Amino acid sequence: RLAPEDYPAERLPELADFYRNAFVEMRSERGFNEPLYEGARDTVERLADEGWLLGVATGKARRGLDIVFEHHDLHRYFQTFQTVDHGPGKPHPRMVLDAMGETGVRAEQTVMIGDTSWDMLMARAANAHALGVSWGFHTPGEIEEGGAHAVHHQFDALNAWLDAFEPGPAKGDPA
């Protein structure tokens, strides 16, 4: 998404590897800060205070996730941490299924919030509610094509959806 439009498609994997390696090196530098999106911390704290069981299903390695969570003091809000270190990555549903298993939550009670089409495909494959956010890696159209039940463009809209959430089969899914 961030590569120039005229960048050769056959070189995209090489560019992605370069970016990944540069990011790992940059993250190891003293004082590096990977900021949260504005509104993310407030939403996490509110949901935890209201008794939501929170989990992470990420394409990051556990080491990278821990660096971000330690920097922002987020571990205490989450009950399950699913990373690509222990099984297939997205869009395979294993991370969501493992998170549900660890927390004792059923699919109809589960909401996967993500910023990629792969998050939506993973959620749908696990029969969970698939909510997209437009401020991340994929475009809203790509997220919708991945099967999002809804795509939100601001935390206020996401929070309103979560406030109205009632467990049950995801919209458009069989009961």
Regions found by a protein language model. Give the residues of each.
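Asp-based, Mg2+/Mn2+-dependent phosphohydrolase catalytic module
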Residues: 10, 46-48, 52, 61-175
